[in-house]
Amino acid sequence: VPMSSRMPTILMLRMDEYHEKVIVNKDNIRIIGEARDRTVITNSGCAKDLDADGKEKGTFLSYTFLVTGNNVEVENLTIRNDAGDGSLVGQAVAVYAAGDRGVWRNVRMIAHQDTLFCGPTMPKVARDALPRLIPEGVTSVGDCPLTLNRQYFEDCYIQGDVDFIFGPYRCWFERCTLFMNKRGGLYTAANTPEQSPYGLVFHNCKLTGECAPGQAYLGRPWRAFARTVFLHCEMDEHVSPQGFQDWQGGAPVTERYAEYGTTGARADQSTRHPKQKRMTEADAAAYTIREVIGGYDNWHPQHRTPTWFLCGDSTMADYPANAAPMTGWGQALKRLVPENVFVENCAVCGRSSKSFVAEKRLNFVELCLRKGDKLFIQFGHNDEKPDVDRATDAHVTYPEYLGMYIDAARRQGAEPILLTPIARRRFDENGKLQHTHGEYPAVMRDLADYRGVRLLDMERASEKLLTALGSEGSKVLFNWQEHHLNYPDGVQDNTHLSDTGAVRMAQMALTLLEEAQ
């Protein structure tokens, strides 16, 4: 994973149970599990564990999953801390969200006391991860007030008992389920800084559990200026009729604690803590995602940058430095797209439309796809190969496999785009370019028309380019090297592109895409 990159790095986790502590200390990363309930990261660290000096490690080194990087998205997996009951082992954090602009979608977070902490790295933790601390004395960025780090949670399941969602950050929870363990306790414990107008906000969430009725409190203030608000949430009988609770011997509930539009068994707010705010409709309407976590950079986690996913073979794939100047045109495309587009090159050398599916690569791509994305599908070079793992029949199984990619994209609200394979550099003795892909390109053209899919006819466009350059002139587009550090004996490759050729093909794809609008 690069230390810094404009485009996110996507990490796919296969279904398994991973027993380890994870530290994500780099920016712009998407971590996606294959199946939420069966892709599990777990550990059993707890506050009472001893360090090398024989001292208790404390809460903030007990985590299973720590994120200090910014712009990190975690999706479709489970993160647990299996240390056990907090009355025996102390605090045991499952997720420690320390970065800024963190996004968590369809993630299960399961522990007991202190399941989810949203706050900066503490001094002990900084020895293990890059700290993201606010410099002392800083109160603004430019002309804007300082925005403390922000986290966004959507369709998550968060389970615990004592203060199990806590910390100082601004956080928005959308359609999340909060589940109280049998022990009972408090869903939240915010410690919002005095200068922050927002803390923990729960919108359209469900509060439930397995404790005795009335033994789950909405929260208590960890510090004097703590803020927690529940908007349009469903609360069942496990929730205490009192709602919030004072911190015994500490901070009391104030008007910074509020709720509005509650439904379910605890919809009646007449029995709530006397100091919590009774919100009006106008008060509640002022709480929006943009207002709460937008900040000085106007961040909105529901407005995402579209990604172009590339599925194909070696002519499209990325190559390491020791293969240079051989370059896939998908690799070159990343340099040419506008800043409002990301490119995720999933192409793999040697794959056909069939083998790419058989290796479950399409399954993972589908997990990543979102509405507004594009899926570029270019196969043919290896479908014509004779081996059983890759070969497809041009008129039967080839269009069937291509249809799987089209269906996967459309299921996720993404646009599928078919691309015929680029031409090989193969001229006859008379200098005439030869067709080398058989009937596969023609079948793809017919399929695009039948399924109503945009087609980029890279074969015809690249044939036109190679014909114009001629047998000798076209060598510059391919990996033809007499002497090169990576090819000391030289190489004459008429299929794979040089960096120059990759750029030309990527430019060609962009031109065809614009023409096909």
Language model: regions and residue ranges:
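Sequence-level preference for short, compositionally simple segments enriched
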Residues: 4-304
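A cross-domain feature marking catalytic cores of carbohydrate-active enzymes
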Residues: 15, 120, 347, 379, ...
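Short, surface-exposed alpha-helical segments at coil->helix boundaries
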Residues: 38, 327-331, 438-442
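Serine-esterase "nucleophile elbow" of acetyl-processing enzymes
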Residues: 302-347, 363-375
